[in-house]
Amino acid sequence: MKRSLFTAFAAFLALAVVATDYDLNKPFGFCTRSSRTDANSTYNVTGGGCYTYPIPSDFTGKVIVLKSNGEDMKNNIQNAIKQNDVIIFDGSNGDFIVSSNVNVKGDNKTLLGINNARLCTQFHITPEIITALNNAGVPHMNTHEGGGILPNGQRVREEAEFNTRKIIIGLTGDNTESYRKSGILRVAKENIIIRNITFVGPGSIDVGGNDLVSFNGAKHCWVDHCSFSDGMDGNFDITQSSDFNTVSWCTFSYTERSYMHQNTNLIGYSDREPTGFLNTTFAFNWWGPGCVQRMPMIRVGKIHMLNNYFSSTTATNCINPRMNSEVLIEGNYFEKGVRRYYSQNDAISVTWADSNHAEEPNKAGQPISIGTPVTVPYDYSVAPYADVPAAVKKHAGATLKK
């Protein structure tokens, strides 16, 4: 079922730069469904009751506007989310600093950024740390075995992780390794909307640390027009039976701050993830500079990859369907220099549509469809692949304005 849903236009939206008809500016895709097959099983994603700015004058929910105080704001943010329906992050006072993951407590919440709101981890990888890791030869160490016992008594299985953590303990003097908790949001609730926020992590590094943003059992959530960079473990992972979520118009990237493990998006934490969950739509997203793998790597769920843009020339694998996954891949654009953009391992079904476009051949072999054709239970249309680069580069990320 492919009707012209993407030609709709939400004229009421004030917080928007809508110069492309492809941006619906409202929840769509799997987040609006309660079944992976039944189109009549719908869900009304409302968040805290509003996802636009300015807030409508007749809105009766609880709203709070947060500004940075220049210090660790984890508790401030966590309490604001707990006590309010709509949480507005106003970036006019600078970055919001967070020491470790903020747990989103309570269903039916909207988190909305204005004035270039950035949520940043307190810890970050420094040039001194990177130099020490290089001098020790960490990039050439084993990532499967050969570990040891750290000065704090912790046993580590892998050689690269062991030496990385040992070096950071030595440089920082932090035997508790609190830096490994560097992340920003953890969501395990229902009906959550996150829009127009930039999330900045400490830099990717192989220490078994936190993701920048993680969905652990989150359901019916819409993440739209956000930017993710330099997550320690992943930029945005969706696991632990999360279900019916949509990620749209977001950007994923890494900077020189990141060192190893630039694995951006994981769907399903392992092959043991329970089946029947993790149904997710990715539409009009941009996997850009520095991304190496997991764009996304997919286990278990039914995943719709629609009109996404891939430009990372460092990629060793972009879309990677794996155990028990069903994946529909349509209208995506792989830029020149992206030479390893698809492989699959033990997927149930993959539909690789003719509407995808790659500037270069895939070094892992020409993608092909396997299994039963994959369908999704909602209306949509596929934008021409030629429109994708310009539309996504201009409008994806935290680009909405007042």
Locations of the language-model features?
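Right-handed parallel beta-helix
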Residues: 95-276
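Low-complexity, polar/charged sequence tracts that form flexible coils or short amphipathic helices
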Residues: 215-216, 228-229, 238-239, 258-259, ...
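Extracellular "leader-to-stem" segments immediately downstream of a signal peptide or signal-anchor
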Residues: 2-4, 19-86, 95, 128-157, ...
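Hydrophobic h-region of N-terminal signal peptides that target proteins for export
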Residues: 10-18
